[in-house]
Amino acid sequence: MSGHDSGNAKRGRASFGAFVRKPVERDVVASAGEAAEQGSLEAVQAWPDDAVEVGAVVDAYGLKGWIKVATHADAGRGGDALLDARRWWLERGGERLSARILQSKTHGDTVVAHAAGVSDRDAALALRGFRVFVRREDFPELAADEFYWVDLIGLEVVNEQSVALGTVSGMIDNGVHSIMRVEYPAVGKDGQPTTDERLIPFVGVYVKTVDQAARRIVVDWEADY
């Protein structure tokens, strides 16, 4: 069993949905309205319920309006959502845009893409700092034993004796495999209610079943481990 996961969680980066958020360039050299005036982007109020943040625009690529996106997951490990989706959703501050993607491809550890109507480098530079979202329904299909992190967050975890172990609050990539962060209610040293955490490797030897419909994961793990 494997978690379809997100690249390295080192250097204190926090897991974000299915992915690991990477630092992005915040310098914005022009208003995105300049690009919108060219018919490339549509300002939107409505936002998809299943939108998942998958990257951020960090630079222009070339001279013909392509943008460069630092992805929160490598292509082949969740970042493929950017390559499959033909519609991206962009957000920066209070500004939200919808972009129709004409072409996209990997470039080193980034994804580069051309949005409809973004015709030159200046228009592409105007999009720097936008966070990029893709609808969950546009993610590539996975094998039966693979899961996106975003689909595991919030699932109940029980062991084979039906003892409740907690709820998946996040995922960690240790470079070898994924690890579930499972939160459960506890009592602190002061006698007050608190929340504690157990870490369970997301590998077949421990994870026996993942039932997304029932929102439950069954593991070979004891409460006192």
Swiss-Prot record:
Residues 144-225 form the PRC barrel domain. One of its GO terms (cellular component) is ribosome. The keyword Signal does not apply. It holds the Pfam family PRC_RimM. Keywords: Chaperone, Cytoplasm, Ribosome biogenesis, rRNA processing. One of its GO terms (biological process) is ribosomal small subunit biogenesis. Signal peptide: none annotated. Coiled coil: none annotated. The keyword rRNA processing applies. It is found in: Cytoplasm. One of its GO terms (molecular function) is ribosome binding. HAMAP family: Ribosome_mat_RimM. Belongs to the RimM family. An accessory protein needed during the final step in the assembly of 30S ribosomal subunit, possibly for assembly of the head region. Essential for efficient processing of 16S rRNA. May be needed both before and after RbfA during the maturation of 16S rRNA. It has affinity for free ribosomal 30S subunits but not for 70S ribosomes. The PRC barrel domain binds ribosomal protein uS19. Binds ribosomal protein uS19. This is Ribosome maturation factor RimM. It comes from Burkholderia ambifaria (strain MC40-6).
